[in-house]
Amino acid sequence: MSQMLHIEIPNFGNTVLGCLNEQRLLGLYCDVSIVVKGQAFKAHRAVLAASSLYFRDLFSGNSKSAFELPGTVPPACFQQILSFCYTGKLTMAASEQLVVMYTAGFLQIQHIVERGTDLMFKVSSPHCDSQTAMIEDASSEPQSPCNQLQPATAAYATSPSVPIPLLTRVKHEAMEMPPATGPGLASKRPLDTGPRDGVAVATGAAGTPGTAPLKLPRVSYYGVPSLATLIPSIQQVPYPQGERTSPGASSLPTTDSSTSYHNEDEDDDEAYDTMVEEQYGQMYIKATGNYAVQEKPEPVPLESRSCVLIRRDLVALPASLISQIGYRCHPKLYSEGDPGEKLELVAGSGVYITRGQLMNCHLCAGVKHKVLLRRLLATFFDRNTLANSCGTGIRSSTSDPSRKPLDSRVLNAVKLYCQNFAPSFKESEMNVIAADMCTNARRVRKRWLPKIKSMLPEGVEMYRSVMGASAASLPLDPEFPSAASQVFEQRIYAERRNDAATIVALRTDAVNVDLSTSANPAFEANEEVDGAGSVIQEVAAPEQLPADGQSSPQAFEQGNTSSSRPQTPVATATRRPEGTYAGTL
């Protein structure tokens, strides 16, 4: 048998995509042109179709080499989104977030819509008053402001061959102040009471205002720094606000077709993770070096603070979206308000949702009422709740009777809100969509069952091998809770004798073992009284069994007359060292 040679190039896909981006910038080998307000953008048809469901439907069955977008799409905004399709990086000003997010939703670019919109409201948290605030994974190490501004970052941002990071990062880029003039930073500071024009004033240690006002920092996705941060002498030039208009309704479909992006299978895996209940958390600067943050610092006067105060922007629906859907949304969305404000979805229903979450649903849905229903359901119900539910309670004869319907109070409020948004939306269609989401959630969870089985403790596999073929033939419950509960449950049905001693027989292929009440008093206390089939559960716990339960295996071993008998699960589970699997009978 000949040997097989395996060659693997790390980050090969990112390198190829970077080369395609270079070709696009040079105008080489491009097979399609996107015309926006008379300005043509050359690109590769395959890259656009892979990044945008809108372009995939547009290119389907159409061999034209030029396509024109609605005249209300701003060219500068489309240029940024086109660059994102090749690099996975998006940089925009804080005041342009809503327009960019809505344009990305119109083009059906899910990565921007689902990740960018969730981070949009985190950027301007009311307690985010540090010079640099980062949203990273929990395993990342604290970084000092000096380390974040290394020259290598500029090369990383400009080189197309650098692999795209897997985690989304958001940075606030602001002008660095001298370390000698910075006092200890307070953990909480009041909001800036200055004019709401997007300008924050930096003050020195002595209380003298800065020579020039600083613009609000630009938002950088995937850790791309702004040029003004790397080179402080260069000032940022804001984009013309007149061009930042949202796309019109000339190309928006008014009905959900079979190719709608929320009817695709690939959307089902992430539709339930886009909403986070507490997504407006506090972000503080990570103090390093000589700047230690006190637990209860003394209040510092506003005049002596040497950092930039970033206010929390108030949000409202864009005027371009209102012109398409009218005034069918929640009445509070048409006026500016705090994104963390709790709104009652329907008056008198008692079902509440934050302003930011509800606006996120409308920005993603646009004029599509079915997409709005899916987004609202994904906001109120997580994936596990949907997977363990039968939908609206209308179940078929083959459904598992243990599945309970979704909360009727929340479900009725969502239905009523969607009917107010689209009066022609039938309740039967809503029930089908809710049931379909539950089915998709179960299908996604079943994909992870082999991985969960591979992570089971060794005690479970040992126990099944000792119990023999009868116990091994019992499959794991496909609906058992996953890693969130940390409880692994295997049901074994035992027989119960009718005598007063209540002896449980554990039958295996090799031998029958009888545990009497005198030999195992702890087991008698835990034994269920009702029913003919008792259930024995295995619980994964780091601690050992209590002292009174450890005496039972010793008594059992003393009563053993044959050395050829296999060791019972009770004795094996008890002898395991601390920190491993412990079976509880």
Curated annotation (Swiss-Prot):
Give me the ranges of the annotated region Disordered.
238-269, 541-585
- Any GO BP: protein homooligomerization
Location(s) in or outside the cell? Nucleus
Q: Where is the BTB domain?
A: 30-94
Give UniProt keywords alphabetically.
Answer: Isopeptide bond, Nucleus, Ubl conjugation
TM spans (from-to): none
User: Where does the BEN domain start and stop, copy by copy?
Assistant: 348-445
What does this protein's UniProt record list under function? Functions as a transcriptional repressor through its association with the NuRD complex. Recruits the NuRD complex to the promoter of MDM2, leading to the repression of MDM2 transcription and subsequent stability of p53/TP53.
Name of protein: Nucleus accumbens-associated protein 2
